[in-house]
Amino acid sequence: MQLSEGLAAHGTRRAGKWKRTQVPLLGEECADMDLARKEFLLGNGLAAGKMNISIDLDTNYAELVLNVGRVTLGENNRRKMKDSQLRKQQNENVSRAVCALLNSGGGFIKAEVENEDYSYKKDGIGLDLENSFSNMLPFVPNFLDFMQNGNYFHIFVKSWSLETSGPQIATLSSSLYKRDVTSAKVMNASAALEFLKDMEKTGGRAYLRPESPAKRACVDVQEESNMEALAADFFNRTELNYKEKLTFTESTHVEIKNFATEKLLQRITEILPQYVSAFANTDGGYLFVGLNEDKEIIGFKAEKSYLTKLEEVTKNSIGKLPVHHFCVEKGTINYLCKSLGVYDKGRLCGYVYALRVERFCCAVFAKKPDSWHVKDNRVKQLTEKEWIQFMVDSESVCEELPSPASTSSPVSQSCPLCEYINFKIQPLRYHLPGLSEKITFAPKTLCRNLFSQHEGLKQLICEEMGSVSKGSLIFSRSWSLDLGLQENHKVLCDALLISQDKPPVLYTFHMVQDEEFKGYSTQTAQTLKQKLAKIGGYTKKVCVMTKIFYLSPEGKTSCQYDLNSQVIYPESYYWTTAQTMKDLEKALSNILPKENQIFLFVCLFRFCLFVCLFVFFLR
């Protein structure tokens, strides 16, 4: 079965049955895993053992679930961890899992608590994890909810919100650097978005900066350009004197370092990506290695072969940096690397590593952006091209979950809603006798046909709606097909309930007694939730419950599965008000076929009319 992009789990149909399959991916070996709990391993090409993120299919939730393995939790416990690398790796795993879910329609993270006697209410999570969440999210409670369930810790993640004009994708690090006075700093998501949009608007920029107008001579005036000019003169010298004092200091265009010779190659390899990115994305600049904190020329001792190797390391490091072009020319990073000889009383005693980087026409990354999503049943890191496309083009975000071809709007956006309702919508309204008129059923023709053809269905619906004070029940021959998935022909029909004070419920009705429909129902509900956020534009927390009923030929009914009795969500996922009902119906109108879209326009119109009448009578 072919699935829409971005879904974590998929169902296969075998002899009419749906089963949630588990296929091992790249990463750690799956051979030793319990066959009942095989999971999708992270397929990002990183070394096995370092990454421990997997897609967990052994779950009752209609959610994308990422398992991050064993994690030490609690501020004191995490602070006392002896293995700092393990603490860092756990933080990265959890943070990347959060990022992937934010960018993939939401879900939750499952972590097995490493430390005994852990209590969320007493111990908290851990300051390093909290800081990672805060750095990624504008307001953590709007996106994350935390829950301990025995020895497991769950982090419920709402889909990244598209309600603002800010970044359209969650990011741990842009990997785009800039010079900030005397430092190379990574751009946060907002700064990166502004930088990229400026580049896109102008189609890149010239390699050479515009020449400054001539200035009158002012002896006492010192500017950034003075330090840059002195650094340029220093770079162009052929000989340097040992212990000579510099006449300039670090600035926007100058960075000074001093490393021990035995670690020189390693340290230069480590720092080059961020400093080259920063200089290239700003206005160019100079990196000098071999000067001490007192701005004295010290140099480092090296053979000629070592200097050659140093140039090769520089060339290879800069050549591997990811770049993205908005311009037509698509040039390369311009730089010049050399080793300046240091002399002590005429005797060569060492070298200073000198690197000049010209400003770049477009964007230079230090490495791939640290941003993740779930695609093709794998947790993947975005390439710089994908990330930029999502950042600057909000339409690209929706492409992760392709909308069915039938989801085009049935009416022009310029057509007044009331005019459209008067001519098209009134016949679709439908109410069942004995139930509150605040409960609406649709589409009218399909409802009547189903109730007349299948004895017991109407009575079952009346019983299920008995506790609903206000809501809409939207029937479909196949909600799975409406959402772009494969239809199960053994399903009689599906119905989605959107009601006040309860989460949405997806009902599945069938007449095949010995069949298993849990996988079908779960997959449909999960896809619906993801599309509500990524295509429909729904910005609040939401979960979709599932309920499966068997209808016998004699009209008898029985509930085969009720997700609400199997799972627990944070309280915030159960808050459904009149406003959230309206927002859900509006989001559904963006992803449904035309017939159901029309019904949702009815719901929106009735809600607006009700509010207007209420305000009128209050006056």
Curated annotation (Swiss-Prot):
InterPro entries: Poxin-SLFN/SLFN_N, Schlafen, Schlafen_AlbA_2_dom, Schlafen_AlbA_2_dom_sf, SLFN_GTPase-like. The chain crosses the membrane at residues 598-618. It is found in: Membrane. Keywords: Membrane, Transmembrane, Transmembrane helix. Its main location: membrane. It is a single-pass membrane protein. It comes from the Eukaryota. One of its GO terms (cellular component) is membrane. Signal peptide: none annotated. Belongs to the Schlafen family. This is Schlafen family member 12-like. It comes from Pongo abelii. The gene is SLFN12L.
